[in-house]
Regions:
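Active-site metal-binding loops of divalent metal-dependent hydrolases
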Residues: 19, 171-172
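Conserved acidic functional residues
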Residues: 115, 170-171
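Conserved active-site-proximal phosphate/metal-binding subdomains
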Residues: 145-167, 173-314
Length: 314
C-alpha cells in the first residue's frame, strides 16, 4: 500500500483515464473490479447520461470508482450536483482552475485529484487543497498542455515542486513503464490509451482496430492555437496541418474543427473525417484485450521488472 492506494481505496495504484467517448460505466467498473480505479469520462456526456452511467457503475462494482470532469464543461454546476447527489466519492478534475471547485467538493466529502501539465500548476493545486495530482506528459492522447514536457521530464519536476501524492500519466502502457514512473517519483499511474483499446471501452471497434495498427510517428500534437490535441493521421488531420501551415487563425481552425468531430471519430468510427485521439504509446499496443487481461499483464510485467537487476556497477 502507498499514498495513492490508501487515498483511493484500490488494490493497485493504477487509474484508468477518464477519456471522452471511451470511458463509460462498463470500462470504469471493469477497471475497478480488477483492482484499479475506473473513471467515468463526463466530458462527452450530457448530465442525464452521466447520472445513468454513475448508477450503472454503482450496480456493476462494489469497489471505488470516480468521475473525470473537465472544468470547462458548459453545464458544470449541474454536473457537480449530480456527482454529489449520486454519492460519487472521487472526482478527477482537469482543464481549469482547481480553486474553483476543490473546496466545494471536499466540503461534501469528495476526494479531489487534478490533472496538470507543469510543476507550476502542480503548486497551484497544492494551494487549492487538492488531495493528489496527475502529472500528464506530452505523450498523452487527446488534449495536452502547452508546455510539451515529456513524462520522463515532468514527473521529477513535479515531485520536486510539491509534496502531494503524485500520479504519472502520458505514454504509460506497460508494467515497465509503471516502474519507470515510480522510480522518477510517482506513486501511481493513470493509463488512458491502453484502456481505450480494451473490449469494455465504449469507443468504436473500427477506431480501436485502426489505433492498434499505428506505429511511431502516427500521432501528432496539433491545434495549438486552440487546445493542443494529439491527433491520429487521417484526412481531417491532414486538413488541420494544411490550415496551420498556411497560417490559419484561431477562428478559422474552430470553423474547420466544427462540432462533434471527436464523437464522429472515436465513438462512430469515421476514420477519415473524425477527430481521432490516442496517445503515443499506441505504437507498442497491437492486441485488443479485456480489462482483466490488461490489468493482469500490467501487474505481472511490473513485478517481473522489479525483480530484474539494473545495476551497472561492478
Amino acid at each position: 500500500m502507498n499514498r495513492i492506494t490508501s487515498l483511493l481505496g484500490t488494490q493497485y495504484p493504477i487509474i484508468q483515464g477518464g477519456m471522452v467517448w471511451c470511458s463509460g460505466w462498463r470500462l470504469a467498473s471493469a477497471v475497478s473490479n480488477a483492482g484499479g480505479l475506473g473513471l467515468i469520462g463526463a466530458g462527452s456526456m450530457h448530465p442525464d447520461t452521466l447520472r445513468e452511467h454513475i448508477r450503472k457503475c454503482n450496480a456493476a462494482t462494489k469497489f471505488p470508482f470516480g468521475v473525470n470532469i473537465p472544468l470547462m464543461y458548459p453545464q458544470i454546476e449541474e454536473i457537480m450536483n449530480i456527482v454529489v447527489e449520486e454519492g460519487v466519492k472521487i472526482v478527477f478534475t482537469s482543464a481549469g482552475n482547481p480553486k474553483t471547485w476543490t473546496g466545494w467538493l471536499k466540503e461534501r466529502g469528495i476526494t479531489v485529484v487534478h490533472v496538470v501539465s507543469s510543476s507550476r500548476f502542480a503548486m497551484k493545486c497544492e494551494e487549492a487543497g487538492v488531495d493528489a495530482v496527475v502529472a500528464e506528459g506530452f505523450e498523452a492522447g487527446g488534449h495536452n498542455g502547452r508546455e510539451e514536457t515529456t513524462t520522463f521530464c515532468l514527473i521529477p519536476a513535479v515531485r520536486e515542486a510539491t509534496t502531494l501524492p503524485l500520479i504519472a500519466a502520458g505514454g504509460i502502457g506497460t508494467g515497465e513503464g509503471i516502474l519507470a514512473a515510480m522510480v522518477l517519483g510517482a506513486e501511481g499511474v493513470q493509463i488512458g490509451t491502453r484502456f481505450a483499446l480494451t473490449e469494455e471501452s465504449s469507443a468504436s471497434p473500427v477506431f480501436k482496430e485502426y489505433c492498434l495498427s499505428l506505429g511511431e510517428g502516427d500521432t501528432k500534437l496539433l491545434l495549438k492555437k486552440l487546445a493542443p490535441t494529439r491527433l491520429v493521421k487521417n484526412a481531417f488531420r491532414e486538413a488541420v496541418e494544411k490550415a496551420e501551415d498556411s497560417g490559419a487563425t484561431s477562428e478559422e481552425l474552430r470553423t474547420l474543427l466544427g462540432r462533434g468531430r471527436a464523437k464522429k471519430g472515436i465513438f462512430e468510427g469515421d476514420l477519415e473525417e473524425g477527430e481521432l485521439e490516442i496517445g503515443q504509446v499506441s505504437a507498442i499496443i497491437s492486441r485488443r484485450q479485456s480489462v482483466a487481461e490488461v490489468m493482469n499483464e500490467l501487474v505481472e510485467s511490473y513485478r517481473q521488472a522489479v525483480e530484474k537487476k539494473y545495476l551497472f556497477e561492478r
